């Protein structure tokens, strides 16, 4: 039998204060829908900074957005931030929910701009790479930070034993994962149909119903009160061209301040 707790950050704000430094870097897998809202880019920027500081080991970046430019954009970010060795994975577009696309998406605007070198790194299948990475980790050591759809996590739960592990997906997760933090849902009584849940409701039901570890949820109303200011973006001046700045400028007409939904899930998973 598996037991789990599902906790909202609304009821656990103490996680953001007085945290004790971990004895070793937190092992993180980042699950993103890169190409939808632009806050995924800043969330990934945070993870690179945590890795620079030795606070995390970023094991895998897994994408659940069916945009042909999403994975190239993530590879580009890896290269720009000096972490080209971090594996990138994605599910085939036909296995992901169809979504309306903002044309052009910021991932296309940046990746196809020619400003940044294209990467030749391989993009792996998300579930296969999840299984490979998880199987190699110590038991109960991995924190998955999910800031997009739950499609890949459902596929992971449903996965069969393979060359990496004799365990089926749910049992592999139970053995290797310590915590799932996610941005998703809304619990303020406004009956808000939050994007990460409503776009793939069967996956959300499967994850909330069958996930075998504790889940910490940062809902819409938490990140909706925190803003990344345009003034902070303007102060990034250490590179003549920066993919973070270009992504924000491509997403909406500048200047604008943007909510920090995904960043709260990252902070909860690390801190």
Regions found by a protein language model. Give the residues of each.
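Sec-dependent signal peptide recognition
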Residues: 1-9
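Bacterial N-terminal signal peptides
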Residues: 8-17
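N-terminal acidic, glycine/proline-rich low-complexity segments
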Residues: 22-271
